[in-house]
Amino acid sequence: MSGSLTLLKEKHIRYIESLDTKKHNFEYWLTEHLRLNGIYWGLTALCVLDSPETFVKEEVISFVLSCWDDKYGAFAPFPRHDAHLLTTLSAVQILATYDALDVLGKDRKVRLISFIRGNQLEDGSFQGDRFGEVDTRFVYTALSALSILGELTSEVVDPAVDFVLKCYNFDGGFGLCPNAESHAAQAFTCLGALAIANKLDMLSDDQLEEIGWWLCERQLPEGGLNGRPSKLPDVCYSWWVLSSLAIIGRLDWINYEKLTEFILKCQDEKKGGISDRPENEVDVFHTVFGVAGLSLMGYDNLVPIDPIYCMPKSVTSKFKKYPYK
């Protein structure tokens, strides 16, 4: 990348806008299973860039509703695919961003809540769908979706919190499940789940200190962050690590200047978008987490983003906080 480093806002907006015009590309159809997630990533990036109107609200809402899986009572990534917790959260986030949760209607909302709660297991963990994959991503996904819907209960929250705490490791990180390797994305899902449950006080001061050190040690000499020791830096960890540090009040433990430079070097200055590392191909996933990371660092008057929900603070400020009064 040549010249002085700056965020190419307009190019990123045009890049995101162009993604749905590439239906002639084979890659477009290979990513069907990520379509609803991709719309959430794109919309959130546009919100951070202060350009949510780039997407046509009515068209997005219509597509979200077309992904409803009536057999299981939740949202799939694409019409006629199977429902999953991850895509259900994306659907709820999109509708909440547009202040359109009421389009669900009473019956669909009841079924949606039942689907989410029904994926919780006896140990407090959640499976993503009926096929049974279990890890801390789905605990966060379930609690986040229920929180946005205002439907958290102690029967769901308390065992979920117990499971998350069992995933804390001796090195200050969190794993996919108890005794699994620490990973930055799991730090976010676990800390995010505890924050949504209003249970961060279940972590001792010493544990919070250890978590902070493990997270800030993810920064490498070139400025980028990795997900675990001995791995390459990746722009997406600008979100997973920074949001986790923000949740525990240690955001300034990262060198902002170096991380900002790393993210900006990952931009495609011709077509827009952000990649995982400099000179690699861009995608909407790394674009949203790149601009979200910059927002957390207060860069260039970007729209403030909530580190717990990865949604604009102007949206999350309306959510009911658990425990409900």
Curated annotation (Swiss-Prot):
Binding annotation for geranylgeranyl diphosphate: 183-185, 228-240
Cofactor details (free text): Binds 1 zinc ion per subunit.
Enzyme Commission numbers on file: 2.5.1.60
Named cofactor requirement(s): Zn(2+)
Record-listed Zn(2+) binding positions: 234, 236, 286
Enzyme class: transferase
Reaction it catalyzes: geranylgeranyl diphosphate + L-cysteinyl-[protein] = S-geranylgeranyl-L-cysteinyl-[protein] + diphosphate
GO biological process annotation, one example: protein targeting to membrane
A Pfam short name: Prenyltrans
PFTB repeats: 9-50, 57-99, 109-150, 157-198, 208-249, 256-298
Subunit structure: Heterodimer of an alpha and a beta subunit.
Note: Present with 1520 molecules/cell in log phase SD medium.
Job description of the protein: Catalyzes the transfer of a geranyl-geranyl moiety from geranyl-geranyl pyrophosphate to proteins having the C-terminal -XCC or -XCXC, where both cysteines may become modified. Acts on YPT1 and SEC4.
Similarity field: Belongs to the protein prenyltransferase subunit beta family.
Record's protein name: Geranylgeranyl transferase type-2 subunit beta
Organism encoding this protein: Saccharomyces cerevisiae (strain ATCC 204508 / S288c)
